[in-house]
């Protein structure tokens, strides 16, 4: 945090160009009588007690002097970007810690953003996190300087090695953050990977239809239970929780499938989908096989990166906390949770895989392609035999509200 700290002056010192210079003409203040107890002086006291003449003359040590007025004025300076309380002058302008950190991060990482509206979004305390494009645009418009970020020295509150800065500027120790946040993500898993089923860990083993359906049910239930127990998610409004899971359940399912090395052989998947039960055109078979191929590709690409459990947990949190869900009551808060998860993953990868500088980027690049796996196809392949025509969104809502007491309509998970 860049703070403006005024150096302390003795009230008897002359202040050129101000009325404070009159203080030197005031009659000397008599010292304490002999034998009086000695009182230690502090910078706040500024030496002997101020006389009324000194106070009126503008001694900076007094509560009513111009130094105090200047400090009070500084405390009321607003951030030129969002209007929040300014913490000082950063990169050429008075800004809050949030806008300072956002501008610094955007410039140092050379980030580019896209506006989903008309590139004229309101940027204030309540909307500053909703459009990064317009926020950066306003930072530059009000005069924040890119070159000040590139050439400026590291401010005192810049996170050093072993620290991690949240978007509100509060530094946290990196290791305590990882051991806290990521460990909670890991502990939220209702099933360790090995408990998804022994067959799941044998990629070459062709699973039967019933085993495939049961494994899929476990993975979907695991995704919802995990979300219910991770930090911050239970604090969201229940409508927001449902909206987030309805949008992201299929992506979480693919990540779980990759994590447990779920076998994805075409024949049993087609059988599980019930496509053999009724005549179908060749085009429909080809279309389903193409969807299965896409699913297989996404799983294999994740497996090729040898993603560890902590990375999977962070990836799932990044996927879950998306502002793309419809009807969210607090979009900015959800975005901040996604950013925390992303930053935690970045710090973890840097500390655990220092010899793989591109690993973090490769992991993030896998996330957008998860949506290429159709959620309706996942329903058809894995859940029709279990729930029939019951919408998967209904099951997710029931799982979220029922918790561990949830039972499948047609098959209980043992």
UniProtKB/Swiss-Prot annotation:
Keyword tRNA-binding: no
Native species: Homo sapiens (Human)
GO CC aspect terms: cytosol; nucleoplasm; nucleus
InterPro entries cross-referenced by the UniProt entry: NHR-like_dom_sf, Nucl_hrmn_rcpt_lig-bd, Nuclear_hormone_rcpt_NR2, Nuclear_hrmn_rcpt, Znf_hrmn_rcpt, Znf_NHR/GATA
CDD domains: NR_DBD_COUP_TF, NR_LBD_COUP-TF
Entry annotated with the keyword Transcription: yes
PROSITE patterns to which the protein is assigned, alphabetical: NR_LBD, NUCLEAR_REC_DBD_1, NUCLEAR_REC_DBD_2
Compositional bias (Gly residues): 58-67
Ranges annotated as biased composition (Pro residues): 27-37
Compartments where located: Nucleus
Disease: Congenital heart defects, multiple types, 4: A disorder characterized by congenital developmental abnormalities involving structures of the heart. Common defects include transposition of the great arteries, aortic stenosis, atrial septal defect, ventricular septal defect, pulmonic stenosis, and patent ductus arteriosus. Some patients also have cardiac arrhythmias, which may be due to the anatomic defect itself or to surgical interventions.
Sequence positions bearing Phosphothreonine: 51
Resulting phenotype, residue 228 to E: Reduces transcription activation by 40%
Residue stretches of biased makeup (Low complexity): 38-57
Subunit organization: Interacts with SQSTM1. Binds DNA as a dimer; homodimer or heterodimer with NR2F6. Interacts with NCOA1, NCOA2, NCOA3 and PPARGC1A. Interacts with ZFPM2.
Domain of life: Eukaryota
Protein name per the record: COUP transcription factor 2
Region annotation Important for dimerization: where it falls in the sequence: 337-414
Purpose of the protein: Ligand-activated transcription factor. Activated by high concentrations of 9-cis-retinoic acid and all-trans-retinoic acid, but not by dexamethasone, cortisol or progesterone (in vitro). Regulation of the apolipoprotein A-I gene transcription. Binds to DNA site A. May be required to establish ovary identity during early gonad development.
Region (Disordered): 1-72
Resulting phenotype, residue 341 to Y: In CHTD4; the mutation results in reduced transcriptional activity
Positions of region (Interaction with ZFPM2): 117-414
Location of the DNA-binding region in this protein: 76-151
GO biological process assignments: anterior/posterior pattern specification; blood vessel morphogenesis; cell differentiation; female gonad development; fertilization; forebrain development; interneuron migration; lymphatic endothelial cell fate commitment
